[in-house]
Amino acid sequence: MTKLGDVLGKELLFFDGGTGTVLQGMGLKPGELPETWNTKYPDRIVQLHYNYFAAGSNIVNTNTFGAFITKFPLELERFIKAAIENANTAREKVLVEHPDGKYYIAFDIGSCGKLLKPMGDLDFEDCVKLFKKTFAAAFPQALEPAPCGLAKINCVMIETMNDGYESKAAVLAAKETMEDLGIAAEDLPIIVSNVYDKECRTLSGSTPETMVAMLEGLGVSAVGVNCSLGPLEMKPTVERLCRAATVPVLVKPNAGLPKVVDGRTVFDVEAADFVDAMKELAAFGPMIMGGCCGTTPEYIKELGSRLEVSGSSQAGRCGAASEPRREGSERPLAGCSEGETSPSSLKPKTYNLKPNIGCVSSNTKVVYFGGPNRPVLIGERINPTGKKKFKEALRNGDIPYIIHQGMEQEEAGAQVLDVNVGLPEIDEKEMMLRVLDELQNVTTLPLQIDTTKPDVLEAALRRYNGKPMVNSVNGKQEIMDTVFPIVKKYGGLLVALTLDEDGIPEDSAHRVAIAKKIYAEAEKYGIKKSDIIIDPLAMAVSSDSKAGIATMETVRAIHEMGGLTSLGISNVSFGLPLREFVTASFFTLCMGAGLSAAIMNPLQGEMIKAWKCYNLLSGRDENCTDYIEWSTVEGTRLEVLGSRGGGGSLPLGSAANASSPTPSNGGSTPVTPPENSGSQSALSNAIIHGLKTDAAAATRELLKTTESLTIINEHLIPGLDYVGKRFEQKTMYLPQLLMAAEAAKSAFGEIREYMEKSGKKGAPKGKIIIATVKGDIHDIGKNIVKVLLENYDFEVIDLGKDVPPEVVVEACKKDHVMLVGLSALMTTTVAAMEETIKLLHKECPWAKTCVGGAVMTQEYADQIGADFYGKDAMDTVRYALELFK
């Protein structure tokens, strides 16, 4: 039988469908853990897998979705080995009937159920270790041959991931376990599938494009989407995945929306309707299709029989659309008209991959380089070179000063931030990690890791949440031998300087030769040309009047080769008066030669003017929209500065700044920022930006002149409300929401300490119980709600996870609690939620119930008798505020 890695992306493959809902039909009780059936009822698990294989699944998942040491501290290895044996038994059984079939086994693992820092309390490295313990028990089976000739497991399926950072931890754990065991990457492909909402965002705010950028950088074999939505609701996400990805895309929707019938969870889309919708998704080009919650072997059988794919060439691989990728692009894919429904016989779509398009990403934003995209602005100010105050901040550990440098550059228009914290007298690795952590908390921009030390580079790339830029490599063999393996492991867009053992060539031809050498060496490591951005090196014209020409010629030559280029623009004007004008003019000339990106100071107005005008005149500013918007803001800025009688820049958060710290809200009703002193008070501003230290300092200052209650009502709560509304409008995302909550928490801490000292301690708004229901160990959503409720001054009684109904009722009676919040992630535990609600209504009739979680809908909540359905954390907060008025 052909190895899975040899057929991935070359022909349409079918995955299996749901597990939990099918096992419920086989007798799985509410709260019972499916993994225990691997040893308790192995014949039923074998039958489950066999039914999917017989229905047409090429790949089935092992029954190990929740197999973590935290859940099974004593029997993890036994359950995992049994799960793999059960799947292999099913495969051998179906091969007797269909000896020429292609049948593969995916080792399946889901989310660990905890939020990673800074959103939660799980450390990134602890998360990696958690996944490693699971993989260490499973992956030896990838070295053990099955009777069919393949290994007992043929790929890794990391699925139902709500957080890109956890996805990265899982992928690194898989890669490092494979390396420890000597398993080649091609022998055990890694597939990662995330959960997206209707707005195409994960819980932590990632988009399909940001996930593709990071996961492809990490070297996964396929990316995808599963769970949460039905096939029609998934359509925008699937289209965007297929547009962005150059690896195969997997699609596994739910069978619509869940509801409870006779105590069991069922879904509202029948098999025939499910397949009709899947045919529409197939037009976008996913090469792996299956089902998730609510789907059964019947669904997979009908899916396979009605999606017959002719041809199996590499051209069928899902990839970027025929038009180059652009950030924010929402055009239909080439070959697919909007709303197209495919015929029953489908041929894989052919995608014209554009190798000259590179990208970097943060958790929530992707930036594309090259092609029709605008030259990218990389902010240079987080760098101690020539900056006395910055050096002092590094020596003193003044992280807030450094973070403000990043925030100012983002507001001024930077799209990527360079991060260099190298000073001989400090621990650069420790400082780099601290700055990276804090910057990623307060800015949406991708970062460029700028260091000459390999250990600092590796630590930073490992910690970074996204796909970063890496500054830098050069043509020296020793440097390439050191840097390329690190970048290959973690991913990144690598800046490559055109210098080698002989120094910096004066002429363009020799610089181009070094670039070609770097490309060739990178290819040996499997690093694509689109992941290399050549820096032709801008030299000072004050010492060589022809230096600018040599650099521009190199930019043009690399561009004509289909390569990407970046420059530290300001070097060209070193030693000259009025440097900003020389630098801006050189910037324009280089953009005309094909420059992809510039490391520059976005606070210099001439540079921004040059960039705006170039985009306008080169056809990169459709309908002149960006230029007109900017010119209006620029006019206001000049009027303000003129009225002050001098130059300078406007302060952070002022109305005339060019952009907000988060993306625009896409045309929805604007959110008015809190009032007080300027556009925002210092405290509100600190909360909005998630600055804990600043929030505490601003609160202490306010307490000198202002009553505590006034601070809460006029500064603190307005800041939280502002972030909450932007979260609801999808212009801020969960990381920013939780960082704002942490900043508010530090402010509340100062207020409480002051009130205790003065004997004025106030009572909380009310008591609220929260719990994850019996049988469910996932508490991510519950913990998010807890953080927000506490910051709105509620006393939260957290009963934890896997909580029996009787325990909830007892706690409610004890404190006569008015509101109980219940959470569930898995469909198999909704029955326990219904049981808890019924018991609460009977024993505690005064209490209201609020429910939430990945499987919940308004209809579902109504069916099980809940008083309120919280679609997200802020929805729950608003309900609590209304209830406790």
PLM features: residue spans?
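Intrinsically disordered, low-complexity repeat tracts
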Residues: 150, 312-313, 318-342
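Domain-level signal for soluble alpha/beta catalytic cores
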Residues: 1-311, 328, 335, 349-533, ...
